[in-house]
UniProtKB/Swiss-Prot annotation:
A GO CC term attached to the entry: ribonucleoprotein complex
Function: One of two assembly initiator proteins, it binds directly to the 5'-end of the 23S rRNA, where it nucleates assembly of the 50S subunit.
MF GO annotations: rRNA binding; structural constituent of ribosome
One of the protein's GO biological processes: translation
Encoding gene per record: rplX
Protein name: Large ribosomal subunit protein uL24
Species of origin: Alkalilimnicola ehrlichii (strain ATCC BAA-1101 / DSM 17681 / MLHE-1)
Quaternary organization: Part of the 50S ribosomal subunit.
UniProt keywords, alphabetically: Ribonucleoprotein, Ribosomal protein, RNA-binding, rRNA-binding
PANTHER family in alphabetical order: MITOCHONDRIAL RIBOSOMAL PROTEIN L24 (PTHR12903)
Homology family: Belongs to the universal ribosomal protein uL24 family.
Pfam family membership, one: KOW
Amino acid sequence: MRKIRQGDDVVIIAGKDKGRRGRVIRVYPDQEKLLVENVNVVKRHRKGNPQQGEAGGIIEQEKPIHQSNVALYNPATEKGDRVGIRVLEDGSKARYFKSNNELVDG
């Protein structure tokens, strides 16, 4: 079970975007990276291709960030928080915040 999943709200805890919040767009488990919206935005210079109708120019896009630089956002404390995994009575696994022991998904 992954501690951070697609659709989670996260806080950046290290790097040039430290302190910013965003939603996870995509998870790359083999690289241990996450794509977070409006975080780690870079500018790419693209050459136009008139044969295919593509315009050139400067394009901004998000790049993946390593999952160690991200913490799950806890709405109760309004901060980034560490996450653990616990087995419930029915045998299923659930994620919980380590600061206040509340379940992440309910």
